Amino acid sequence: MAGDNRDPTKCSLFYFALGKVKLVHGLWRQAAWHKEQTLMLKFLGNDFTNPRWKTAALKNAFALLSKQRYGALPPNILCLNLTSIEEYAAAFFLLGGSLKDAVNVCLKQLGDFQLGIALARVVEQSNEGPMLQEIITNAVLPIAFQHGNRWLGSWAFWLLHRRDLAVRILLVSVLRTLEKCF
């Protein structure tokens, strides 16, 4: 591996969502140029089905988020130059088994509901998982109504198995649909 275009931190979020911890560990073995290689190899060499290491991953995620809030990171916390601190925190939440926290980071800190949807679909391996349904109901639909985006609203209702509302939102004004839904 050579340079930033082969940086294992850039793909960790997606590989952790797929459950490919060993693959990320292998990528870190090849990243001899990265200053955090030794620390990450040691950390990723642990068994994340063990509650102790799940907790360690979650603590690292919260520490990364607090760095963003307070501007300083304690020296014992893993900090890597990913696209963003929040994205790497979401990766550690997935490593620790907390899809809900990873999705909340995507929605609240990153403002990226599409990334949250992608993570929920991959981790839950379904278009009908509880986390995906929650994202659609509590994030996507409000955005669709707020911006008057009929297509987004129709897509969201379709995934919620509300085919009647999915069609109606395309034909009737968004505000009238909102009144009939709630």
PLM regions: where:
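Extended alpha-helical solenoid/arm regions of large eukaryotic scaffolding proteins
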Residues: 1-182
